[in-house]
C-alpha cells in the first residue's frame, strides 16, 4: 500500500466510483449504507462520477441510483457521455483493422471453443452465439446480446463501425491469464490497452483508453481541479490507472494483491460496504 499523500479532509472535490466489486456486489445493487454515505459526501459538496468497464446503457441505472452529477465513464474510459444532454464528450473505439486482427487471434483453434467473444459497437453487444457465459453476462448487465454468427459482419470500414471494446470471457482463469500474456507480446501498450476487470474477463481497447485518462478528462476539461482533489475507489486491474492518478486511491478489500499494493488505502470488501467505510474515513 502506498503512503497517503498530504490530503486533509475537506480537500476532495471529486469522488469517482467503479461499479462491479466496488459499489455493487453479488446482488447487482447498491446497498443502503453505501448510498447513504455517497449522499452524505454530496451534501458536503463532493461531486460524484461513475467509471466502469460496463456498457453505457448498463451503467446508467447505477449512475442514477447514486445521483452522480457528471458525465458517465463507460467501457474502461473509451466512452464518456453526459446522461442529461446525451452529449458524448469522448469516444475512442478500436480500429476496424485491429479488431479483425484480434478476432483472428482469439478464434485460433486452441482458443475458439474455450472463449466467448463480445464486440461492443454503438452501445450494442454482439456475440457469435448465446451460450452460458454470455447468458450470465446479459443477466447481470441487463443488456440483450445480438447473436450474429461471424463477428466480422459487424465490422464496416466504410462506416468506420468498429468495437468500442472487445471482451473475451472464459471460466478458465488460467486461459484468460495466458491470453493476456500472449496478446501483450503481440501488441505494445501504444497499440492496444489490455486489462482484466475480473478474473474471467480479458478486455481490449484503444491505447488512449483507461479509467485514469478518463478521470483526467473530467478533472481538467470539465472541472478544472487537480488530481490531488480527487478520490477514486475500485477493485481490480482496470482500476489501477485511476487509483494511481488520484490524491486518494482506495482499493476494495477483495481486490488482487497487486491492486492493493498501489492503493493509498484498502477498504473492506464490497459485501462489507467498503465504499461507505472509505467515504466515512476520508470525506465525512
List where the protein language model places each region.
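Short, well-ordered alpha-helical microsegments
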Residues: 56-60, 176, 212, 239-240
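Mg2+-dependent phosphoryl-transfer enzymes with acidic/Ser/Thr/Gly-rich catalytic loops
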Residues: 4-14, 31, 203-284
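Hydrophobic packing residues within well-ordered alpha-helices of enzyme cores
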Residues: 34, 59-63, 179, 183, ...
Amino acid at each position: 500500500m502506498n503512503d497517503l499523500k498530504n490530503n486533509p479532509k475537506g480537500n476532495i472535490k471529486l469522488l469517482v466510483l467503479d461499479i462491479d466489486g466496488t459499489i455493487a456486489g453479488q446482488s447487482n445493487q447498491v446497498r443502503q449504507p453505501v448510498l447513504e454515505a455517497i449522499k452524505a459526501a454530496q451534501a458536503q459538496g463532493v461531486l460524484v462520477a461513475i467509471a466502469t468497464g460496463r456498457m453505457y446503457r448498463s451503467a446508467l441505472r447505477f449512475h442514477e441510483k447514486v445521483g452522480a452529477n457528471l458525465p458517465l465513464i463507460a467501457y474502461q474510459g473509451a466512452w464518456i457521455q453526459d446522461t442529461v444532454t446525451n452529449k458524448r464528450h469522448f469516444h475512442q473505439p478500436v480500429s476496424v483493422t485491429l479488431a479483425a486482427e484480434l478476432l483472428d487471434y482469439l478464434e485460433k483453434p486452441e482458443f475458439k471453443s474455450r472463449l466467448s467473444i463480445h464486440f461492443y459497437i454503438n452501445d450494442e453487444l454482439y456475440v457469435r452465439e448465446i451460450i452460458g457465459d454470455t447468458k450470465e453476462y446479459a443477466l447481470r448487465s441487463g443488456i440483450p446480446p445480438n447473436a450474429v454468427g461471424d463477428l466480422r459482419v459487424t465490422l464496416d470500414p466504410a462506416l468506420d463501425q468498429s468495437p468500442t471494446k472487445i471482451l473475451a470471457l472464459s471460466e478458465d482463469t488460467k486461459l484468460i491469464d495466458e491470453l493476456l500474456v500472449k496478446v501483450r507480446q503481440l501488441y505494445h501498450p501504444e497499440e492496444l490497452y489490455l486489462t482484466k476487470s475480473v478474473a474471467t474477463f480479458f478486455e481490449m481497447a484503444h491505447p488512449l483508453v483507461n479509467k485514469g485518462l478518463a478521470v483526467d478528462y473530467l478533472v481538467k476539461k470539465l472541472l478544472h481541479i487537480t488530481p490531488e482533489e480527487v478520490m477514486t475507489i475500485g477493485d481490480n486491474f482496470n482500476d489501477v490507472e485511476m487509483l494511481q492518478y488520484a490524491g486518494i486511491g482506495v482499493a476494495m478489500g477483495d481486490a488482487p494483491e497487486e491492486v492493493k499494493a498501489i492503493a493509498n488505502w484498502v477498504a473492506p470488501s464490497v459485501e462489507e460496504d467498503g465504499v461507505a467505510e472509505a467515504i466515512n474515513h476520508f470525506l465525512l
